A protein has these predicted regions:
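Short glycine-/small-residue-rich flexible loop motifs, especially phosphate/cofactor-binding loops
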Residues: 11, 38, 70
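Short beta-strand->loop
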Residues: 23-24, 55
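Short, functionally critical alpha-helical segments immediately adjacent to catalytic or ligand/cofactor-binding
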Residues: 6-23, 83-88
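Extracytoplasmic and endomembrane cell-envelope/extracellular-matrix remodeling and assembly machinery
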Residues: 3-4, 48-51, 55-76, 81-150
Length: 150
């Protein structure tokens, strides 16, 4: 995300998508911590074989998510609320809805329930994270953290 000059907060999105569970599977078939569906995974060259599915690979799926947000940012004029809603509900759905309603502000749009609640849910999660872990957000924080887990 840093290398693509994306807002670093977007790297927290898997908390909303999957609680950072790299093996997560949704009721609609989206997989991995970024919850890529088949079509988007294919679009970003994530292999979906019988033995290996790159949507379960945290590194490959994170790289794909960064590319996807780079594209969404460009498409929605770097309005990250719109980009987040597009990530959740689909960019074509969002663009069509914006055109039908004649609105280009996320907060003015009337969307399906899940994308309508997605941005507030993400912002609430960020607020909780910033209050609980303020040292992750001070100016000049390291560009990466090394975390060991067993």
């Amino acid at each position: 995300f840093y290398d693509r000059r994306l807002p670093p907060e977007l790297a927290h999105l898997p908390m909303v998508e999957s609680c950072f569970d790299a093996k997560a599977k949704s009721r609609t078939g989206a997989l991995g911590m970024w919850q890529f569906n088949d079509i988007t995974a294919k679009e970003f060259n994530l292999d979906q074989g019988v033995l290996v599915d790159d949507r379960y690979d945290w590194k490959k799926s994170t790289q794909a998510a960064a590319k996807y947000f780079e594209r969404l940012g460009k498409r929605f004029d770097y309005d990250w609320a719109l980009a987040l809603a597009a990530y959740n509900g689909g960019p074509n759905y969002l663009a069509k809805t914006m055109k039908q309603q004649g609105k280009d502000n996320y907060w003015d749009l009337k969307l399906r329930e899940e994308p309508q609640n997605y941005v507030p849910k993400f912002l609430a999660m960020l607020q909780v994270a910033k209050e609980k872990y303020p040292y992750l957000y001070y100016q000049g924080a390291p560009k990466f953290w090394i975390v060991a887990a067993n």
